[in-house]
Amino acid sequence: MIELKNYTLNFGPQHPAAHGVLRLVLELEGETIVRADPHIGLLHRATEKLAETKPYIQSIGYMDRLDYVSMMCNEHAYVMAIEKLLGIEPPLRAKYIRTMFDEVTRILNHLLWLGATALDIGAMTVFLYCFREREDLFDCYEAVSGARMHATYYRPGGVARDLPDTMPQYKPSRWHNEREIEKKNHNRQGSLLDFLWAFTERFPRCVDEYETLLTDNRIWKQRTVDIGIVSPENALQWGFTGPMLRGSGIAWDLRKKQSYAAYDRVDFDIPVGKTGDCYDRYLVRVEELRQSNRIIRQCIEWLRKHPGPVKVDDYKVTPPRRVVMKHDMEALIHHFKLFTEGFCLPRGEVYSSVEAPKGEFGIYMVSDGANKPYRLKIRAPGFAHLSSFDDMVRGHMLADGVAILASQDIVFGEIDR
């Protein structure tokens, strides 16, 4: 009698569909997954511990590198935690700028997710189209911070600087003729807000393009419909947030339920799924692209009409302007103390969370009155989502496991921390 045994397969961490450094130990019966055991920790960098050894302002850059696709949203949760402990409120213009860039970040995240998921499932064209739009938004990051990804733009009490009046332009070179340069610089003649407004006018057509390629595509639907179904009850029990929770039919969004920044001043809808499968999660994220575009347009309209300060006028928390610092001794001392020692927070604890593109990104901060946190705990949405992978994937084929993993939108920078 031949003894039949289940087959054990290692998936990742080098696999291109592993979304970073995920290692899955899969138990297979033929091609059907019987059990999945995710192994994490291969990107652990001790971010929480590092933040506990540095002044508050020096850890903003660490936040960018957690979920390195949702940079400014991570910063937002961190600086909001500091602001709550300090008891300060950023100016309204800073709140609108934060809201606008949170939505720019959401579009950046969802475009990468859409392109990578399509590529995993076998559709390459969408991947190229998504990266075409991402480049324009990275130009906005670069215009305000000088960096295309890890911006470190948000600050306790506001943002680092106001929006620029000019956009970087392409210069003539031997690789591009004048006609090409003129075409590339067509939308770069005005300010950042003008550039972003032009983007929001053409972006809905781009989303229609993606949907034309995927939404009614027979192969796409065969790979995603009724795959990885999660009921609303299970979604809550697993601790789902963001598109994973809304895809299962629960309209929970921190931007509406626990409003922060300027989200209570803008209009948008919360897309919700019905079935809780990979296809619903896809539709939710595509609709979020449209809603983010809508929010950005409202922010641009307000910012154009309302100039003003972008950070609190308190030299204990925010550095003085360089013009003042170079002529005033007191301002110079404040500047020096702020960047060498930082500032002290009153004793206490606080939890601050934002609706990041992947779900609820939270910062739990404990202060003992020093210039650095006594304890910093990061609540990453992807950790809860990956925990449910075994439950979601059981009984599915091996190829479906790739689609389910892609629908979770996993990034290991935040999971391993």
UniProtKB/Swiss-Prot annotation:
GO cellular component terms, alphabetically, are: plasma membrane
**Localization (cell):** Cell inner membrane
Q: Which PROSITE patterns match?
A: COMPLEX1_49K
Q: Which InterPro entries match?
A: NADH_Q_OxRdtase_suD (IPR001135), NADH_UbQ_OxRdtase_49kDa_CS (IPR014029), NDH1_su_D/H (IPR022885), NiFe-Hase_large (IPR029014)
Membrane topology, as annotated, equals: Peripheral membrane protein
User: Protease among the record's keywords?
Assistant: no
Q: Which reaction does it catalyse?
A: a quinone + NADH + 5 H(+)(in) = a quinol + NAD(+) + 4 H(+)(out)
What's in the keyword line of the UniProt record? Cell inner membrane, Cell membrane, Membrane, NAD, Quinone, Translocase, Transport, Ubiquinone
**Primary location:** membrane
One Gene Ontology MF term: quinone binding
EC number in record: 7.1.1.-
Which SUPFAM superfamilies does the entry mention?
Answer: HydB/Nqo4-like
Q: Which NCBIfam families match?
A: NuoD (TIGR01962), PRK06075.1 (NF004739)
| Self-association and partners | NDH-1 is composed of 14 different subunits. Subunits NuoB, C, D, E, F, and G constitute the peripheral sector of the complex.
The protein, known as: NADH-quinone oxidoreductase subunit D
Source species:
Legionella pneumophila (strain Corby)
